[in-house]
Design a protein with these regions (language model features):
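A short beta-loop-alpha structural element at the N-terminal edge
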Residues: 28-42, 48-53
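Conserved acetyl-CoA-binding loop-helix of GNAT-fold acetyltransferases
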Residues: 114, 120-137, 156-160
Length: 201
């Protein structure tokens, strides 16, 4: 049995002016360093484990999967350290974002995650702004992200920031019943006829 999840591919021209978000003094930006890879992974996990995207991308539903995902991102050609950030409050990580610049100048924003309990505080906008700045500084001309169609709040935010919906892509996930449990596994994403790229949530 399979389930198909529609996702919007959203893009923006760079540079994109994102309004300055006044963060509390207790907040700290933590730039990328390889030693923070597990901190990014755990923040991704805490941000997405109970969200619908954990069905779309099963790796998000467990810590090991998030570690594998984060290692895959930072090993990707075009990984953008300047677009990869942790946000901490009093030394506790509450937000994460990663970036990749492709050869054609597309800057991919990946895994914009805010830990529950710290949302609706402007942290998402701040993370996106940091990522876009880093992608542009690395040579990206266009910013791109994917968002699940049902994530209305995120879509509204991205539209407000200046992103536009470029196309709809479809991700098919295999769902297998096993003893009263549901086991999910991702199948290759498919897109509408127009050729496109795939990025993580």
């Amino acid at each position: 049995m399979t389930r198909v999840f529609p996702r919007y591919r959203m893009t923006c021209a760079l540079p994109l002016a994102v309004g300055v978000v006044a963060l509390p003094e207790r907040c700290q930006w933590v730039p990328w360093h390889h030693s923070w890879i597990d901190s990014h992974a755990m923040t991704i996990y805490e941000s997405f484990v109970y969200e619908p995207d954990a069905l779309v991308y099963p790796n998000l539903a467990n810590r090991t999967g998030c570690q594998m995902l984060m290692r895959s991102i930072c090993d990707t050609q075009g990984f953008c350290a300047g677009a990869t950030w942790l946000l901490a409050i009093d030394g506790v990580y509450v937000g994460t974002v990663q970036g990749v610049v492709e050869d054609d100048g597309i800057g991919l924003i990946q895994n914009v995650g805010i830990v529950p309990g710290h949302r609706r505080s402007g942290f998402g906008i701040a993370l996106i702004g940091k990522a876009l700045h880093g992608l542009h500084a690395a040579g990206a001309k266009t910013g791109q992200l994917d968002v699940t169609v049902g994530n209305v709040a995120a879509i509204r935010l991205y539209l407000k920031l200046g992103f536009t919906i470029d196309k709809t892509i479809y991700r098919t996930v295999a769902i297998k019943a096993k003893r009263d449990r549901v086991v999910v596994g991702a199948l290759p994403a498919v897109t509408e006829p127009r050729e496109g790229r795939r990025s993580n949530p």
